Design a protein with these regions (language model features):
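TPR/Sel1-like alpha-solenoid repeat signature
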Residues: 72-75, 92
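Residue at a conserved register position within TPR or TPR-like alpha-solenoid repeats
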Residues: 39, 72, 79-80, 120
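Structural motif corresponding to the intra-repeat A-B loop/turn of tetratricopeptide repeats
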Residues: 42, 82-83, 103
Length: 123
C-alpha cells in the first residue's frame, strides 16, 4: 500500500541521513516535503511529525530556508488536524509568514494567510 511505501521510504531516508552529501540533501528534503503533502492530502498523518522534524533538520544543515514556509504550512495543518492544537498551529502559521517575508515573497505570504483563514474556519 501507499502507506507502507511512504513509511519505508521515510525510514530509509532517516537512517541514511548522515550519509547524504549536501547537494543530495536538497533533493531528499524535496522528497520529504512531497511525502508530507501527500500524507496530508490523503489524511495519513502517522509519520507526519517525523517527516516535519527530518525536513527541519535538513534545512538547518543545508541552510535552505526557501521551503520553510511550505513546511510550516504542513506543520500547522498537522497541529490542527492531528493534535487539535490551535495555539501550536498559529505559531507555525506565524513562522510560515515570517519565512515568506524573509524571502520577500508577498504572493506566498498572501496565499499562506488565505489558507490559514480557510483552515481556521473549518477547525
Amino acid at each position: 500500500s501507499d502507506k507502507i511505501f511512504y513509511d519505508s521510504l521515510l525510514d530509509n531516508l532517516s537512517e541514511q541521513f548522515e550519509q547524504f552529501e549536501l547537494d543530495e540533501l536538497f533533493i531528499v528534503n524535496k522528497i520529504i516535503i512531497d511525502i508530507s503533502s501527500l500524507s496530508l492530502k490523503n489524511n495519513r498523518l502517522d509519520n507526519l511529525e517525523k517527516a516535519i522534524e527530518m525536513s527541519q533538520k535538513i534545512m538547518a544543515k543545508i541552510q535552505d530556508w526557501n521551503r520553510m514556509p511550505i513546511l510550516k504550512l504542513i506543520e500547522w495543518k498537522y497541529f490542527l488536524i492531528k493534535q487539535k492544537d490551535i495555539i501550536k498551529a498559529e505559531q507555525s502559521f506565524m513562522k510560515a509568514c515570517l519565512f515568506a517575508q524573509m524571502t520577500a515573497d508577498q504572493y506566498l505570504e498572501n496565499k499562506l494567510i488565505q489558507e490559514w483563514e480557510k483552515d481556521v474556519k473549518s477547525y
